[in-house]
Amino acid sequence: PIYLFIANANRNTVSVVDTETGRTIETLQAELVPGSLSGSTPNSLALTPDGSMLFVANANINAVAVFDVREVGRSKPLGFIPVGWYPTSARVTPDGRRLLVANGKGVGSRANRNGPQPGLTAPASLTEYIGGLFDGTLSVIDLSDREAFAERLVAYTARALRCRPVPAPTPIEAGHPVPLASGAKSPIKYCVYIIKENRTYDQVLGDMPEGNGDPSICLFPESVTPNHHKLARDFVLFDNFYVESEVSADGHEWSMGAYATDFVEKTWPLSYGHNQRRKYAYPSEGRFKIAEPAGGYLWDRALAAGVTYRSYGEFVNNGATTNEPCSTLVPALQGNFDPWFRSFDMEYSDLARADRFIAELKRFEAEGEMPRLQIVRLPNDHTSGTSRGKLTPTAFVAENDLAFGRVIEAISHSRFWPETAVFVVEDDAQNGPDHVDAHRTVAYVISPYVRRGTVDSTLYSTASMLRTMEMILGLDPMSQFDASAMPMLAPFGPKSDMRPYVALPAQVDLNERNTEGAWGWDRSEDMNFAKEDAADDLLLNEVIWRSVRGPASPMPAPVRAGFVRTVATADGDDD
């Protein structure tokens, strides 16, 4: 018989099918740990010429699974080979002496001090756009001596297992508001999750001396973002927080599902960093069923747990005009989203979005209850570059800052504040430079139960934020990533501080508009701002930089970090 081996990228498995009968003979588990949630992403297969061994490239665990398939139906797992970041193709040479593995994202992430900025354009050699920072690598594994390879495979497997994500031990003090045990009660009943667009840490908070910032590349300092700065000082400043995503296409998937599928990861690079975006459809946010992760999204977990939820703009399609209701293609959001809260639309003010959310909040106060999980989109920090007649990048970001402050002010003055935690993150960090890493971004946790006025330099990511909300709300994790993420426990404490927040007014002109003479205005005219990331990101970032810093200001380059988790030793030192 002739057998067909099929990689099920969204399921951690490989199906072996008899091509004569169409029957599935067996299913191979390609995951490092049996029973793992989705997230291994087996996406490429290779057989030795004699058909004795099958190699499975697992993109998201950076390892190749090896199977003995000489007896189909009774195949045996042999081990794992650690390779580079996000392996996308595995091939055995025709002579069977080498296994070649192409690693799509190379060996690691880095900083991008010369990253793009809204409003500025730098020479191509100096532009460190996140979508172009990945240098693919090739792993070459010697198979010429099968006995020697079998011995090496034991060591390879041990290394792969050491590198797997494992939940860190999380000792907490008595009365901690984030429950570790499933079903344990938390004094926090409500989670509000705010998603913003595309900014790095240094771009917004790089001027804060309390954190690890670089003020030389801070484009939207405290004079532009007073509420971002005040909230970071009043509550917690996170200066070591990263997004797993590169752009909005995978960013909204990671923000809602702690995972981006093989389909999304392989589709978005075709449309980003090129000038042919009309050629490919945006793959995410409910547009394609194949993009949906096997573990579902945050609202799916809430639905399964009986937790009430509501979306404001996330995975929502705008009405043709502001007088027409929005819609959604996501079944779980039907009846659980606000049809009058517009999603991404740079012609629509974030202040109007804030007003709509606040009106809903007041309605819930009158009714006596609100959804326990609310997801709110505030996207206008994306900006429209220097398009003639549009708000300047500074005005857009200041508008977003004021909307952010007003939302927090309203929540903290509401009857729900004593039982609420607000989590805030950017969907990605593609539109700016950062001296630590191109994935570092601004993030917030705002609640009566946070340790106010502190700096937390723990290594966190979007998956950490998702895991924390899941623990508070009693939701199951969605993927291997949130299941193994470091939860954000350090910023919380057992004592509450009910002082509300008072939003600061804007300190710049919110109506400042680009003129025909603005740097890059003519290029901005050709950009598509009807949806997120439809404009050329490299050019947009440069346009924003020069619009703020001046036409002659050179844009700073990407930095990639080897991520290090600091651990406090018994004597209090960081090792």
Residue ranges, per PLM feature:
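Short, conserved, GDST-rich strand-edge loop motifs in beta-rich repeat architectures
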Residues: 104-133
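Short loop/turn segments that connect beta-strands within beta-propeller blades
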Residues: 19-22, 69-73, 144
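N-terminal pro-sequences and low-complexity stem/linker regions of secreted or lumenal proteins
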Residues: 155-575
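Surface-exposed loop and turn segments in beta-propeller and other repeat-based domains
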Residues: 25-37, 147-174
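Short coil/turn segments that connect the beta-strands within blades of beta-propeller domains
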Residues: 2, 50-52, 95-97
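Short loop/turn segments immediately following the C-termini of beta-strands
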Residues: 9-10, 59, 104-106
